[in-house]
């Protein structure tokens, strides 16, 4: 097929869009691939659709290779299935809800677990029907509070989501591993580097979970990896827990006056003055000897705001994303939550919280937790706070701290939570070496859902013994529009996009440079011959556009090979340029088609 720029629905831009934050957003708009319709919502133009369809084609081929079958669900969904799994409430403000003229409740699909489950329940009833994997490529909708980065964080986006249905956990393992292998092939074929990392299940639920992260500095996800092969999203990293300490002979805790020490730094300075230690006692006090009690406000899916206090070593910061990922086990309702530092109003409603001198619930001073007549606050601790560890921490009285407060003797906690920042140099949980940190974009996410949705929606089949058993499920997603953005993000230079051949909107971009009829005739003939050879061709046949603009557009659009027909035609040659390397070569006209065909098929 030959796409002629004189006819193609396309306008390139010389200036960056005002709202563009990242290169992929800037270049996809400037090169005429997408146009903004509203915040987080984009229209796909012909060139953009070409790239999108090629990404989808690769996905479909690899899904077919593992026996997955394609279906297509509506994007407008009824409320009832989501009520059955409690996700109508759990999603909170994160979804688009609407009513029909009769008052019926609907939502624009954020995801389709319930619909897949009900479809299989409606059609299948025996173990003989399983295993089954089905998938769709469909629009999804999330009411993002702050859409950003173009296609990377939008309100409408396209995903491939597939689901596996098995009789038992062994079958689920096989389905999960098949999808995992297929995902690695998909990203390899697209030319997109990904790193599989351990992840949390979040609101999806289930057990085993992995993300496929594309490493890039603009990524929203932080992950860690070791030289020995460990890799995990920071939300899923588990702390190396120290051994418990025998505290039977530990000295009693002691409250001391520590005026003007509301921060860890001022507390450490005061500790070294008040209770100096020598090397035999562990050396000078450091932030790691202190227990910092951080007050957080958790907004539940219901909109209710709950105060939580978390105790962490003073040399560690709290990672709010890790808190969000792991605090669900201690909350009264499940679903997507937000966590932030408690504000002035939160603190005012809890007068027992003494800012700068907050301690855990204890028998010394004025206890925060369990105080008669006061509401109990949820108190969680970092895994490093183990029985027998002694701390310097707030005494819940202004200007006072307690020294030698022993965990498990002087104070307890409601639970343990992975919540602190993960640092480069921390030991990998599996002992495979120190961790290094990086950022990435989530390109895919796979889950072993288990029986969560099948139980809620009563998806059962008869097993070999004629007994009804609950089906076990897996969920597997790929961000299709996000893949386009990530490819643009990792394949561009100062002049424009540089698409990998697997997804480029064409194989070759032919440019007629000059105004002579013989130039346009030769460019036309070469375009037709390239098409006849099975290549996709963009042909810039615009008669009144300068060579500079044509070359600028060709480099902005980013097709891998540029063939220029110009002044060299009098010598019987055309210029063929590799867009990625920038290398150009003069090739005889009669050999140009074979040259381009070989270039396309060799990569």
Curated annotation (Swiss-Prot):
Q: Which reaction equations make up its catalytic activity? A: tRNA(Pro) + L-proline + ATP = L-prolyl-tRNA(Pro) + AMP + diphosphate
Kindly list the places in or outside the cell where this protein is found, as annotated in its UniProt entry: Cytoplasm
Please cite one Gene Ontology biological process associated with this protein: prolyl-tRNA aminoacylation
Cite a GO CC annotation: cytosol
Q: Which UniProt keywords apply?
A: Aminoacyl-tRNA synthetase, ATP-binding, Cytoplasm, Ligase, Nucleotide-binding, Protein biosynthesis
Main enzyme class: ligase
Superkingdom of source:
Bacteria
EC numbers on record: 6.1.1.15
Domain observations: Consists of three domains: the N-terminal catalytic domain, the editing domain and the C-terminal anticodon-binding domain.
Record's subunit section: Homodimer.
- Name of protein: Proline--tRNA ligase
Question: What organism is recorded for this protein?
Answer: Arthrobacter sp. (strain FB24)
The uppermost taxa in this organism's lineage are:
Bacteria, Bacillati, Actinomycetota, Actinomycetes, Micrococcales
Gene that this sequence comes from: proS
């Amino acid at each position: 097929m030959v796409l002629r720029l004189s006819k193609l629905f396309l306008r390139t831009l010389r200036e960056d869009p005002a709202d563009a934050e990242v290169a992929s957003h800037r270049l996809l708009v400037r090169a005429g691939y997408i146009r903004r319709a509203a915040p987080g919502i984009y229209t796909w133009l012909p060139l953009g659709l070409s790239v999108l369809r090629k990404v989808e084609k690769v996905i479909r081929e690899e899904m077919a290779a593992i026996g997955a079958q394609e279906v297509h669900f509506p994007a407008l969904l009824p409320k009832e299935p989501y009520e059955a799994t409690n996700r109508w409430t759990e999603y909170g403000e994160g979804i688009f809800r609407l009513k029909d003229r009769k008052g019926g409740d609907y939502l624009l699909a954020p995801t389709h677990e319930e619909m897949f489950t009900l479809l299989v329940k409606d059609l299948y009833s025996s173990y003989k029907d399983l295993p089954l994997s089905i998938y769709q490529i469909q629009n999804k909708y999330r009411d993002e509070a702050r859409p950003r980065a173009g296609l990377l964080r939008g309100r409408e986006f396209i995903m491939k989501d597939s689901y596996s249905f098995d009789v038992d956990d062994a079958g689920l393992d096989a389905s999960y591993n098949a999808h995992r292998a297929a995902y690695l092939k998909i990203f390899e074929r697209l030319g997109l580097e990904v790193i599989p990392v351990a992840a949390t299940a979040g609101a999806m639920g289930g057990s085993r979970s992995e993300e496929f992260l594309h490493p890039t500095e603009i990524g929203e996800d932080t992950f860690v990896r070791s030289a020995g092969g460990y890799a995990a999203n920071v939300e899923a990293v588990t702390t190396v827990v120290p051994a418990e300490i025998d505290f039977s002979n530990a000295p009693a805790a002691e409250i001391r006056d520590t005026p003007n020490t509301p921060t860890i730094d001022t507390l450490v300075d005061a500790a070294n003055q008040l209770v100096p230690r020598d090397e035999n006692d562990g050396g000078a006090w450091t932030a790691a000897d202190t227990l910092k009690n951080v007050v957080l406000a958790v907004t539940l899916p219901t909109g209710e705001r709950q105060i939580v206090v978390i105790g962490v070593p003073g040399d560690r910061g709290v990672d709010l994303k890790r808190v969000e990922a792991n605090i669900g086990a201690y909350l009264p309702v499940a679903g997507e939550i937000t966590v932030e530092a408690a504000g002035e109003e939160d603190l005012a409603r809890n007068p027992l919280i003494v800012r700068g001198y907050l301690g855990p619930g204890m028998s010394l001073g004025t206890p925060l937790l369990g105080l008669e007549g006061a509401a109990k606050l949820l108190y969680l601790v970092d895994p490093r706070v183990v029985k027998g560890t002694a701390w310097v921490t707030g005494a819940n009285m202004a200007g006072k701290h307690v020294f030698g407060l022993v965990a498990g003797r002087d104070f307890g906690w409601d639970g343990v939570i992975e919540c602190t920042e993960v640092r480069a140099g921390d030991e990998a949980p599996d002992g495979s070496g120190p961790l290094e940190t990086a950022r990435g974009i989530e390109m895919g996410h796979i889950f072993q859902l288990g029986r969560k949705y099948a139980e809620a929606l009563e998806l059962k089949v008869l097993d070999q013994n004629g007994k009804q058993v609950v089906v076990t499920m897996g969920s597997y997603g790929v961000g299709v529009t996000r893949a386009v953005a990530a490819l643009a993000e990792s394949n561009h230079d100062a002049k424009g996009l540089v698409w990998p051949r697997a997804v480029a909107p064409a194989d070759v971009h032919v440019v007629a440079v000059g105004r002579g009829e013989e130039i346009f005739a030769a460019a036309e003939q070469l375009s037709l011959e390239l098409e006849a050879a099975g290549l996709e061709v963009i042909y810039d046949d615009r008669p009144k556009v300068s060579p500079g603009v044509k070359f600028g557009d060709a480099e902005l659009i980013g097709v891998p090979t540029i063939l220029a027909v110009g002044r060299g035609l009098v010598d019987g040659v055309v210029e063929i340029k590799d867009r990625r390397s920038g290398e150009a070569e003069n090739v005889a006209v009669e050999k140009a088609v074979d040259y381009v065909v070989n270039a396309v098929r060799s990569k």
